[in-house]
UniProtKB/Swiss-Prot annotation:
This is Ribonuclease HII. Its main location: cytoplasm. It comes from the Bacteria. The lineage of its organism: Bacteria, Bacillati, Actinomycetota, Actinomycetes, Pseudonocardiales. The keyword Ion transport does not apply. Endonuclease that specifically degrades the RNA of RNA-DNA hybrids. Its cofactor is Mn(2+); Mg(2+). Keywords: Cytoplasm, Endonuclease, Hydrolase, Manganese, Metal-binding, Nuclease. It holds the Pfam family RNase_HII. It is found in: Cytoplasm.
Amino acid sequence: MQSALDRRGLGPVAGVDEAGRGACAGPLVVAACALKPGDGRRFEGLTDSKVLSPAERERLYDVIQAKALSLSVIVIPADEVDALGIHVANLEGMRRAVAQLSVAPGYVLTDGFRVPGLGAPSVAVVKGDLVAACVAAASVLAKVTRDRIMTGLHEQFPVYGFDEHKGYCTSDHTARLTEHGPCEEHRWCYANVVAAAQLHGMRSPRTVSSKPGLFDAFEGDVVDNEQL
């Protein structure tokens, strides 16, 4: 997809992806990345960040930082996710990430769904992080950035094990959340966070979006540690 657009003179082509959409704690991180034509073949092992080992992600992160034509990373904190709702926050993060690229893209590839208002022609690519190098690069940037943030949050809130599950709805995280109740880094737009808070007589410390469906943690959001 990216190489076809480059050959037609529609570049530079930027990819956009996120990390943390399914998590019930921590920020949503969105990255945009434009690569030079042919970079996908030169970045050995570049693919969807979720199928890479942590060491492989770190290696590719450094390569992308050094060699990308342009990149940007946007961090949307938990309180903003609560205020906007996760889907709106995701769309807004993608718009911000593309807008902050130092090189205006000729085309933007998004992973799986259409994003209006990107300021350039765009197309949604199913499994884009597996088939488009620029989307894969964006996924690595977002994932590594978010994992580092969650490791830092573990130092502040060690009882939750953020360094292990990275804020996703694992059985271990759910057990810790039930035992201790949520902290300020949890997202109150998730049903499991609200349920744990009620056990401890806690109320949301901030305004939470009431858009339909945003209080549900979907089955697809529940993952094993091995998938993170």
